[in-house]
């Protein structure tokens, strides 16, 4: 896994992992009811303990136990709601797809699966526990993609407008790492509530300007989506980030703290944690063709994989034509009619597993069957070429940037809607009851 991804996992993902892996406490109780599901006190306790341990190892200051507990409960609530949604629509990550994901992670780390397993177990986690946590992470990613993607529309006018801007900027990309703190206000707030939130935001801003640690302050004070990660968003192009960020940081420099900025959800404080510039010169494109089979109640995962393996054997033996097989069997409507041809494309435009597989192939080589979010594939890399960034590339890039920005915004809207429609009851410990 790339270094940046490891950083993202440092507090939250590792905490979630250890939460699900820890042995049950001898005495436990229901701390939160979410629809027909529950969060046990042991889940909260284990996650809080892990966050504290990770913070101590990183020499990071944490807020009060109550503030940290609130953030942990909120994250667990959102996780459980998403997993409940996945269960309702029948979304399951099978072992074959999980194995493929683990193989891809090992390739990114340039190790074998056995070496990766040895490293994980040396850190005190069984490989079976790691697999189940990874299964949950993949499920969360899938349910977010399924539910949020259909809410997003990118118009030709938006694309052409951004293409023009990109061309005016000479394809110069600058990425920002943003720190974000949200002092939330309720729906339809009173003037007193607005004034109170505004005062709290000014106090937080003053503390930050006086040198308080941003991450610790965010964990203690923020109601934003990245609060438990210290309010830190990963590097984003200005066209990818939420509109609120983009409107205020275009002229900011590293270290600047901006705010408070009022919106419908509250008062925002934004810090430019870091910046980096990207210079694009030549772009490598690939020409490929593939066959896609989608598992279903009729076609099992094993059967789909076996069919593709059989197709490959026939093609390699000269007994079948790849293009004809693609036309007859492929379930990708966009390419099946063209014999599976995907044409020339920037490989980063594909889903990660597809991109990684193409990167591992020589020209003319066929892949073995592999799994992506779309189903099971075999792909042939026909050719590679270096090309300047063309107008079509700019258009694809513009669509990608706009989509990512809207995805980030719609993801938070979807989570908020799910939470507002759910039955949630937080049961306080007896020691805190009046």
Swiss-Prot record:
Pfam families, per the entry: Rotamase, SurA_N
GO molecular function: peptide binding; peptidyl-prolyl cis-trans isomerase activity; unfolded protein binding
Domain of life: Bacteria
GO biological process terms held by the UniProt record: Gram-negative-bacterium-type cell outer membrane assembly; protein folding; protein stabilization
Gene3D superfamilies linked: 3.10.50.40, Porin chaperone SurA, peptide-binding domain
Domain PpiC: 173-274, 283-383
Signal peptide (residue range): 1-22
UniProt KW keywords: Chaperone, Isomerase, Periplasm, Repeat, Rotamase, Signal
Enzyme class: isomerase
Reactions this protein catalyses: [protein]-peptidylproline (omega=180) = [protein]-peptidylproline (omega=0)
UniProt GO cellular component terms: outer membrane-bounded periplasmic space
Major location category of this protein: periplasm
Annotated InterPro entries: OMP_Chaperone_SurA (IPR050280), PPIase_dom_sf (IPR046357), PPIase_PpiC (IPR000297), PPIase_PpiC_CS (IPR023058), PPIase_SurA (IPR023034), SurA_N (IPR015391), Trigger_fact/SurA_dom_sf (IPR027304)
UniProt-listed Enzyme Commission number(s): 5.2.1.8
Annotated localization: Periplasm
Function: Chaperone involved in the correct folding and assembly of outer membrane proteins. Recognizes specific patterns of aromatic residues and the orientation of their side chains, which are found more frequently in integral outer membrane proteins. May act in both early periplasmic and late outer membrane-associated steps of protein maturation.
Free-text note on domains in this protein's UniProt record: The PPIase activity resides only in the second parvulin domain. The N-terminal region and the C-terminal tail are necessary and sufficient for the chaperone activity of SurA. The PPIase activity is dispensable for SurA to function as a chaperone. The N-terminal region and the C-terminal tail are also required for porin recognition.
HAMAP family, alphabetized: Chaperone_SurA
Name the record gives this protein: Chaperone SurA
Lineage of the species this protein comes from: Bacteria, Pseudomonadati, Pseudomonadota, Gammaproteobacteria, Alteromonadales
């Amino acid at each position: 896994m790339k270094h940046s991804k490891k950083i993202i996992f440092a507090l939250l993902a590792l905490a979630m992992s250890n939460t699900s892996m820890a042995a049950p406490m001898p005495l436990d109780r229901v701390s939160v009811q979410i629809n027909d599901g529950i969060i046990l006190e042991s889940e909260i306790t284990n996650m809080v303990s892990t966050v504290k341990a990770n913070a101590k190892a990183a020499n990071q200051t944490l807020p009060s136990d109550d503030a940290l507990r609130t953030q942990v409960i909120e994250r667990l609530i959102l996780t459980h709601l998403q997993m409940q949604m996945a269960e309702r629509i029948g979304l399951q990550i099978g072992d074959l797809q999980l194995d493929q994901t683990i193989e891809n992670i090992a390739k990114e780390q340039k190790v074998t699966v056995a070496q990766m397993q040895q490293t994980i177990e040396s850190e005190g986690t069984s490989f079976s526990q790691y697999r189940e946590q990874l299964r949950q992470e993949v499920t969360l990613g899938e349910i977010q993609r399924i539910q949020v993607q259909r809410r997003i529309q990118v118009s030709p006018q938006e694309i052409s407008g951004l293409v023009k801007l990109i061309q005016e900027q000479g394809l110069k990309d600058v990425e920002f790492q943003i720190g974000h703190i949200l002092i939330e206000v309720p729906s339809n707030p009173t003037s007193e509530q607005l004034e109170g939130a505004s005062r709290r935001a000014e106090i937080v801003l003053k503390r930050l300007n006086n040198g308080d640690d941003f991450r610790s302050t965010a964990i203690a004070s923020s109601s934003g989506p990245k609060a438990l990660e210290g309010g830190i968003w990963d590097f984003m192009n200005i066209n990818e980030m939420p509109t609120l960020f983009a409107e205020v940081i275009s002229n900011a420099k590293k270290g600047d703290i901006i705010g408070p900025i009022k919106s419908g959800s509250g008062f925002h404080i934004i810090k430019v944690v870091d910046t980096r510039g990207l210079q694009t010169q030549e772009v490598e494109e690939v020409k490929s063709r593939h066959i896609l089979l989608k598992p279903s109640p009729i076609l099992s995962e094993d059967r789909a994989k076996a069919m593709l393996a059989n197709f490959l054997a026939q093609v390699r033996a000269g007994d079948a034509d790849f293009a004809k097989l693609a036309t007859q069997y492929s379930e990708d409507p966009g390419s099946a009619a063209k014999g599976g041809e995907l044409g020339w494309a920037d490989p980063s435009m594909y889903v990660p597993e597809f991109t990684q597989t193409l990167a591992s192939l020589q020209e003319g080589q066929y892949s073995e069957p592999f799994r992506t979010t779309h189903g099971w594939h075999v792909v042939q890399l026909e050719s590679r070429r270096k090309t300047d960034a063309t107008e079509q590339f700019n258009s694809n890039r513009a669509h990608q940037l706009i989509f990512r920005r809207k995805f980030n915004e719609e993801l938070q809207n979807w989570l908020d809607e799910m939470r507002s429609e759910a039955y949630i009851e937080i049961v306080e410990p007896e020691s805190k009851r009046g």
